[in-house]
């Protein structure tokens, strides 16, 4: 039987128990430009590579969004879907603050986002969201980093990456994450940048124009660093050869600009 008999909507299972529409949405995330999240005992850091503009006079697509004073997110995949989910979470945070006069707890935000994803794959007539989120925030229980995917699954991480060539970034994080709880904020930012650089051929592409850095933590509301603040970390940024993970054998040799789905054309 041909696969296209089972991929016309999200409510049709294949004979092998697969939902092809959800798998296609996951591929949109995997082909988006990379994003990395890492946390220590007091802070969470997000770094994201913004898509190269299609023309010299066009701007970069934003990849990191502030959702509330205590939470924000980075995206990989279809930017329009990410913006819609950002508006949805902002509304949920405002409603919670109106009802309870306090910040929306991070586990509840992650659960609400997962349910939003799941509703789009449970009924015919809707398509899955083609975007993955890294949700970073700080509440009364400490720092949190969640990863959501088009299937509706929500994962709680100490550090992770998503997007194109993210396996190389995860390999770097796996080698260093045990030192994250006790490292300072500046060191944590550098680790996140090195992981992002590992997903971009050793960091040659990282600069203040195409790289976003965001932080949130104890006594620090969620903020996206300005170009001047980010310059401290990105000017002269270099990856040591020993920090560059070997590329997976099966990874295709296409460039980020060729495969990224972040720009709407």
Swiss-Prot record:
Record SMART domains: Proteasome_A_N
Keywords, ordered alphabetically: Cytoplasm, Nucleus, Proteasome
Residue spans of biased composition, Basic and acidic residues class: 256-265
The keyword Amino-acid biosynthesis belongs to this UniProt entry's keyword annotation: no
InterPro entries in UniProt: Ntn_hydrolases_N, Proteasome_alpha, Proteasome_alpha-type, Proteasome_alpha1, Proteasome_asu_N, Proteasome_sua/b
Region (Disordered): 237-265
A GO CC annotation given for this chain: nucleus
GO biological process, one term: ubiquitin-dependent protein catabolic process
Primary location recorded for the protein, binned into one broad class: cytoplasm
Subcellular location: Cytoplasm; Nucleus
Top-level taxon of origin: Eukaryota
Role summary: The proteasome is a multicatalytic proteinase complex which is characterized by its ability to cleave peptides with Arg, Phe, Tyr, Leu, and Glu adjacent to the leaving group at neutral or slightly basic pH. The proteasome has an ATP-dependent proteolytic activity.
Subunit record text: The 26S proteasome consists of a 20S proteasome core and two 19S regulatory subunits. The 20S proteasome core is composed of 28 subunits that are arranged in four stacked rings, resulting in a barrel-shaped structure. The two end rings are each formed by seven alpha subunits, and the two central rings are each formed by seven beta subunits. The catalytic chamber with the active sites is on the inside of the barrel.
Protein family: Belongs to the peptidase T1A family.
Protein name from the UniProt record: Proteasome subunit alpha type-1
């Amino acid at each position: 039987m041909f696969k296209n008999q089972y991929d016309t909507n999200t409510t049709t299972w294949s004979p092998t128990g697969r939902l092809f529409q959800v798998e296609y949405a996951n591929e949109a995330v995997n082909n988006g430009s990379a994003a990395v999240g890492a946390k220590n005992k007091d802070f969470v850091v997000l770094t994201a590579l913004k898509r190269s503009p299609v023309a010299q006079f066009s701007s970069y697509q934003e990849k990191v969004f502030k959702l509330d004073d205590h939470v924000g997110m980075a995206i990989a995949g279809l930017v329009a879907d990410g913006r819609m989910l950002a508006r949805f979470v902002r509304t949920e945070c405002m409603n919670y603050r109106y009802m309870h006069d306090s910040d929306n707890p991070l586990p509840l935000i992650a659960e609400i986002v997962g349910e939003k994803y799941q509703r789009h794959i449970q009924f015919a007539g809707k398509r899955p969201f083609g975007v993955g989120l890294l949700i970073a925030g700080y509440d009364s229980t400490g720092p949190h980093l969640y990863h959501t995917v088009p299937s509706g699954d929500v994962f709680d991480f100490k550090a992770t990456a998503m997007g194109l060539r993210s396996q190389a970034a995860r390999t770097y994080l796996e080698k260093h994450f045990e030192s994250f709880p006790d490292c300072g904020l500046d060191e944590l930012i550098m680790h996140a940048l090195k992981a992002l650089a590992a997903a971009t051929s050793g960091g040659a592409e990282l600069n203040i124009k195409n790289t976003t850095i965001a932080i949130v933590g104890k006594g620090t509301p969620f903020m996206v660093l300005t170009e001047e603040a980010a310059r401290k970390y990105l000017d002269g940024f270099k990856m040591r050869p020993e920090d560059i993970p070997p590329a997976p054998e099966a990874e295709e040799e296409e460039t980020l600009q060729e495969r990224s789905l972040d720009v709407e054309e």
